[in-house]
A protein has these predicted regions:
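Catalytic, metal-anchored helix/loop core of enzyme active sites in primary metabolism
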Residues: 4-5, 9-105
């Protein structure tokens, strides 16, 4: 048995409960929802900015709360492309990373 199948058949697994996410405390969750709703290259921008910001955080060049600031700055600055192609996604990702590194490095 794999993954969730094991829990379904094993009565010793505790029940899972979920609460609504606190989008004020976890701003990136709200930004991710907005990017998903917007579509196009918005998720590529979000991902590139998040990866760059987390990298800077791990290097102790950025505080944890600034990760959301960096992602939001990139989403605001990178022009969105509704026509999602591989090239458009890669370009949006690169632009987002460039913005984060330029602004927060």
């Amino acid at each position: 048995l794999v993954g969730s199948e094991m829990c379904i058949r094993d009565s010793s697994c505790p029940p899972l409960t979920f609460a609504a996410p606190d989008e004020e405390a976890f701003r990136c969750f709200r930004l991710a929802r907005q990017a998903a709703k917007q579509g196009g290259t918005a998720c590529a921008v979000l991902n590139g900015a998040n990866e760059a910001a987390v990298g800077l955080f791990l290097q102790e060049k950025l505080g944890f709360p600034e990760i959301a600031d960096a992602v939001e700055a990139a989403l605001d600055a990178v022009p969105q492309c509704a026509n999602m192609t591989l090239e458009a996604a890669l370009d949006a990702d690169r632009q987002a990373r460039d913005i984060v590194f330029a602004r927060f490095r």
